[in-house]
């Protein structure tokens, strides 16, 4: 019988044997120890001398026991693997060692694990051992032992049964990132970490209105002279001389002065006088007065509209009345004639 198949078969028989067969179990255990001891002696003979001059690569392997018996409720395999196995991958990259989780409970499917363990194949012989981590290093002697020591120190941190340590918190953050359920992605705020901000409604008035003061506490007296409606906040009295804001629906705060309106540029800067000033300066009311005061013909002129209107209707607009007009652009002041009422010449139409 081959040595590769002999040890797995012994372990499989020991596990499948009923506990009532005490002597058979003892004999199987002695045979397993004897076989493992012989393999260990051969390996010790081969490793008796270490050649560091040639600097050849050597293979180191250590099996680190996972304390599942001391802490049966803690998931050490999940902590070692991490989200999608990334924790174990990073640990291998950092240490430069190959790590494998072997033994009972290393597979997720327990029924399949039992089938493979009973199959007797050499590659599944580790399923009969205790749950452990196999660390393998293949490198020159000095570097190989350095990597092994580093790997042992790092693997020790993962075998601490703590749910809230730094490793576990980092794995939870990575898991939330991989699942796309970050706080900023879905908007799920953590209790106690967010600050609630009350929204402020924009002012409807031009230039912005002053926000109303905070509501007074219960029992606070309102100022005299203010009207308080049910369900509305009391409005403080407005100081005399203070301009009120132009926004609708907001009350003025006493003592607040609205900022002055922005000073507009003079019209002179935009060149309005250049285009129209010269034309209106020449054609003032004096220019029109000359046409009425000094007629060009000796015969009196009037406009005959052909409606049978006589000259008496135009006598009220004598030329001497137009001579008293002002020479500015301002409209003439209204006449203060209170006595007679003058009929309009076009009143009949």
UniProtKB/Swiss-Prot annotation:
Biased composition (Basic and acidic residues): 340-349
Expression sites (tissue/organ): Expressed in heart, skin, brain, colon, spleen, kidney, cervix and testis. In adult cerebellum expressed predominantly in Purkinje cells and in the hippocampus is abundantly expressed in glutamatergic dentate granule cells and in specific inhibitory Schaffer collateral-associated and path-associated interneurons; expression is restricted to neuronal subpopulations largely non-overlapping with expression of KHDRBS3/SLM-2 (at protein level).
Domain KH: 65-135
Region annotated Disordered, chain positions: 181-263, 321-349
Localisation: Nucleus
Gene Ontology CC, one term: nucleus
Molecular function GO labels: poly(A) binding; poly(U) RNA binding; SH2 domain binding; SH3 domain binding
Gene Ontology biological-process annotations: mRNA processing; regulation of mRNA splicing, via spliceosome
Post-translational modification: Methylated. Tyrosine phosphorylated by FYN, PTK6 and SRC. Tyrosine phosphorylated by SRC during mitosis.
Pfam families: KH-I_KHDC4-BBP, Qua1, Sam68-YY
Gene3D superfamilies per record: K Homology domain, type 1
Purpose of the protein: RNA-binding protein that plays a role in the regulation of alternative splicing and influences mRNA splice site selection and exon inclusion. Binds both poly(A) and poly(U) homopolymers. Phosphorylation by PTK6 inhibits its RNA-binding ability. Induces an increased concentration-dependent incorporation of exon in CD44 pre-mRNA by direct binding to purine-rich exonic enhancer.
Subunit record text: Self-associates to form homooligomers. Interacts with KHDRBS1/SAM68; heterooligomer formation of KHDRBS family proteins may modulate RNA substrate specificity. Interacts with RBMX, SAFB, SFRS9 and YTHDC1. Interacts with FYN and PLCG1 (via SH3 domain). Interacts (phosphorylated) with FYN, GRB2, PLCG1 and RASA1 (via SH2 domain).
Entries under PANTHER family matching the protein: KH DOMAIN-CONTAINING, RNA-BINDING, SIGNAL TRANSDUCTION-ASSOCIATED PROTEIN 2, RNA-BINDING PROTEIN RELATED
Protein name: KH domain-containing, RNA-binding, signal transduction-associated protein 2
Classification lineage: Eukaryota, Metazoa, Chordata, Craniata, Vertebrata
């Amino acid at each position: 019988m081959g040595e590769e198949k002999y040890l797995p078969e012994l372990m499989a028989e020991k596990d499948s044997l009923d506990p009532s067969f005490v002597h058979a179990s003892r004999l199987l255990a002695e045979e397993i120890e004897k076989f493992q001891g012989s393999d260990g002696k051969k390996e010790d003979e081969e490793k008796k001398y270490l050649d560091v001059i040639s600097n050849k690569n050597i293979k180191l392997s250590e099996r680190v026991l996972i304390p599942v018996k001391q802490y049966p409720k803690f998931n050490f395999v999940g902590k070692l693997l991490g989200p999608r196995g990334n924790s174990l991958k990073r640990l291998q990259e950092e240490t430069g060692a190959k790590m494998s989780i072997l033994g009972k409970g290393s597979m997720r499917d327990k029924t399949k694990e039992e089938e493979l363990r009973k199959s007797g194949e050499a590659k599944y012989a580790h399923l009969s051992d205790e749950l452990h981590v196999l660390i393998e290093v293949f490198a020159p002697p000095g570097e190989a032992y350095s990597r092994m020591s580093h790997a042992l120190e790092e693997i020790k941190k993962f075998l601490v049964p703590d749910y809230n340590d730094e490793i576990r918190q980092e794995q939870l953050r990575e898991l939330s990132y991989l699942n796309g359920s970050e706080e900023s992605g879905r908007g799920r705020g953590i209790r106690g970490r967010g600050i609630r901000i009350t929204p402020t409604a924009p002012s409807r008035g031009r230039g912005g209105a002053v926000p109303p003061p905070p509501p007074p506490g219960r029992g606070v007296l309102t100022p005299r002279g203010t009207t308080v409606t049910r369900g509305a906040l009391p409005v403080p009295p407005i100081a005399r001389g203070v301009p009120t804001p132009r926004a609708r629906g907001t009350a003025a705060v006493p003592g607040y002065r609205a900022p002055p309106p922005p000073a507009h540029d003079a019209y002179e800067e935009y060149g309005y006088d250049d285009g129209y000033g010269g034309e209106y300066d020449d054609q003032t009311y004096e220019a029109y007065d000359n046409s009425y005061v000094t007629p060009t013909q000796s015969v009196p002129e009037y406009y005959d509209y052909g409606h049978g209107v006589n000259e008496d209707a135009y006598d009220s607009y004598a030329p001497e009345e137009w001579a008293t007009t002002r020479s500015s652009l301002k409209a003439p002041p209204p006449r203060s004639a209170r006595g007679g009422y003058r009929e309009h010449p076009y009143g009949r139409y």
